[in-house]
Amino acid sequence: MHTVPGIKVLYFGTPVVLITTRNEDGTPNIAPMSSAWWLNGNAMLGLGNSSQTSANIAREGECVLNLPSSDMVEYVDRIAMTTARREISAYRVQQGYRTERDKFGLAGLTEQRSELVSPPRILECPIQMECRLTVAHPVGGENSLSAFEVEVLRTHVEEKLVIPGTHYIDPEAWDPLIMKFCEFFGGGQPVHTSRLATGWNMPHTLRSLPVPQGDGSGDGSGDGVGEPVLSGSASA
């Protein structure tokens, strides 16, 4: 039997994407998000207009889409409630967001020079896509969200994921990190506690999930995943 519970969050399960862009001062930014999908050689990215990443993409016209594997969840969670914006609303502060301009340092990730665009790739991510902005579409009311259509210029893939002698990724070898209702999943199983789920008071945070084994850096923060739009960041 079906019911109509008035679902507030429609994040049924999509891959986490770490979007790298350049800030206005030239420094790199990372925003975790999961409102993304692909069609042929293009990607559609859903982002909040108040996010640093939205401003960077609109200004610079380029970005890199880095796909983390499920075993990279701790890197992602460290920046899940941070934003590169210098000013944060009182509501976001109450949720646990804070300003962080050095996302690479906080996450413990490594910059890798891109070949066709200015923003760096993330060395640790098995799949990296250098992209150029095609057009931005307004979504929703009050100019709150945008769907950025980007062209994938070049895709870099960890060699062990490629089926030998082909141009295809082995689906059994690739285990993407999935964001499902603000929780992290890999291989269909929860893989890590989520700062985002806690900040957004998701009821299922009361469940028992794997305890983080990292050093705890990035306490209380996130810039893309850390934004309501990790199926579409709103503040990163």
Please identify what each model-predicted range represents.
Residues 1-218, 224-236:
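Basic, polyanion-binding surface patches
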